């Protein structure tokens, strides 16, 4: 969780007050601090490259805004994409295809054709996918994703590496998969696994590295395949709560890269952070519409709901909240911060001690840059909101708000109903 400066009780984002930004662009509004975004990437990039050559593949499913991707392209990031759409958005943002790794699941043939045409590196998820790919092309480099039977994550819904999940080739089929890839004419150059999302425990990252190292050595000994990179996926979490501490990134990088360097001849390490890079770079600003006392409950009704930020409703996730125009004042009242959606589960925060609020106040929801806008919806026929990028004292619109026309533009009434 980031610390923000306060000037005259106003929360500052860059050199601008949150109130000033909200007054200019309206609410609800996602606001990203470009300098925080760059700093986060540099921190993880430098931590790992200090010990061995490392490719940081930004997991763009966390946030695919073109401007954010452009910033990361400038910083030298690679991309982890999970759909053809993410591949194409990344290319439009300036990424060369050879900086994109595609890791799909349940991949249809039409997507395989598109990926081959775009010449991105495909991270094969299943033997079925591999066989279908070789009907289109052979003699291309590929990576193979395994299921390491090592799972972790902030919620059971984001654990991807545990035994029984849908991702990757099961451990007992890994050697056979690499053998078949070689026999089919593919060139396996990488091995990949992903444990889950949002972890603050170092052990799963160490465990999955050890699993991949063991397989890499077995693959080289049995099949004569010398891999070019080892990829442990993403999942590095951030401290969403004030009392939480983030991972010691330098220690983690040193320990993991040591395992790879000392036990393999693989020249390049790779990982796929998403949340770590974008989450705390962004706040969601939302205006107080309504204040309601209901028995022991005090509700702050704001103009953002789970249509805007679904993580609290979907995962039960904690996001820190503050009243941006009363930023330095002490807490007086416990509030539930709720939205305008017609669902009981529509809340952004529960039981938060905040300064006594008034209608028109501005609430800031922290750490909203990862899985925020990308998971938003038009539920209750509410258009999706604007996004803004702040660089010091400059604020730029990087996504326009939708309108009712945007909601309706792909809908049609059959002519027979117009009679």
PLM feature spans:
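A charged N-terminal "starter" segment
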Residues: 1-121, 127-140, 181-187, 214, ...
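Short glycine-/acidic-enriched loop or helix-start segments at secondary-structure transitions
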Residues: 69, 90-91, 112, 133-134, ...
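Structured core elements
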Residues: 78, 101, 121-123, 143-145, ...
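Conserved, mostly hydrophobic/aromatic
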Residues: 37, 61, 83, 115, ...
């Amino acid at each position: 969780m980031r610390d923000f400066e306060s000037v005259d009780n106003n929360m500052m984002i860059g050199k601008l007050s949150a109130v000033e930004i909200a007054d200019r662009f309206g609410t609800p509004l996602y606001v990203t601090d470009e300098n925080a975004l760059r700093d986060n990437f540099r921190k993880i990039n430098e931590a790992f490259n200090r010990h061995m050559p490392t490719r940081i593949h930004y997991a763009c499913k966390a946030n695919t805004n073109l401007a954010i991707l452009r910033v990361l392209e400038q910083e030298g990031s690679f991309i982890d994409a999970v759909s053809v759409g993410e591949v194409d958005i990344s290319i439009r943002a300036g990424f060369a295809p050879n900086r994109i790794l595609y890791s799909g699941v349940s991949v249809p043939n039409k997507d395989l054709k598109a990926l081959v045409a775009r010449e991105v590196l495909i991270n094969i998820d299943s033997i079925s996918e591999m066989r279908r790919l070789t009907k289109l092309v052979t003699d291309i480099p590929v990576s193979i994703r395994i299921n390491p039977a090592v799972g972790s994550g902030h919620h059971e819904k984001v654990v991807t590496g545990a035994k029984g999940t849908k991702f990757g080739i099961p451990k007992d089929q890994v050697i056979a998969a690499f053998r078949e890839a070689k026999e089919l004419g593919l060139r396996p150059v990488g091995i990949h696994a992903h444990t889950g999302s949002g972890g603050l425990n170092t052990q799963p990252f160490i465990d999955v590295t050890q699993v991949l190292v063991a397989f890499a050595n077995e693959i080289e000994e049995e099949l004569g395949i010398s891999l070019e990179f080892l990829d442990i996926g993403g999942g590095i979490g951030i401290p969403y709560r004030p009392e939480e501490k983030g991972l010691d990134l330098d220690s983690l990088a040193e320990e993991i890269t040591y395992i790879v360097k000392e036990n393999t001849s693989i020249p390049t390490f790779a990982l796929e952070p998403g949340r770590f890079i974008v989450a705390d770079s962004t706040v969601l600003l939302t205006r107080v519409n309504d204040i309601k006392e209901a028995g022991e409950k005090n509700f702050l009704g704001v103009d953002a709901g789970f249509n805007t930020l679904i993580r609290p409703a979907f995962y039960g996730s904690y996001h820190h909240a503050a009243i941006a125009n009363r930023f330095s004042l002490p807490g007086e009242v416990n509030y539930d911060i709720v939205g305008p959606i017609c669902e009981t589960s529509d809340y952004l925060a529960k039981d938060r001690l905040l300064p006594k609020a008034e209608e028109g106040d501005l609430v800031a929801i922290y750490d909203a840059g990862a899985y925020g806008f990308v998971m938003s919806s038009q539920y209750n026929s509410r258009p999706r909101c604007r996004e803004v990028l702040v660089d010091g004292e400059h604020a730029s619109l990087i996504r326009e708000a939708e309108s009712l026309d945007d909601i309706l533009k792909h809908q049609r009434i059959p002519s027979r109903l117009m009679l």
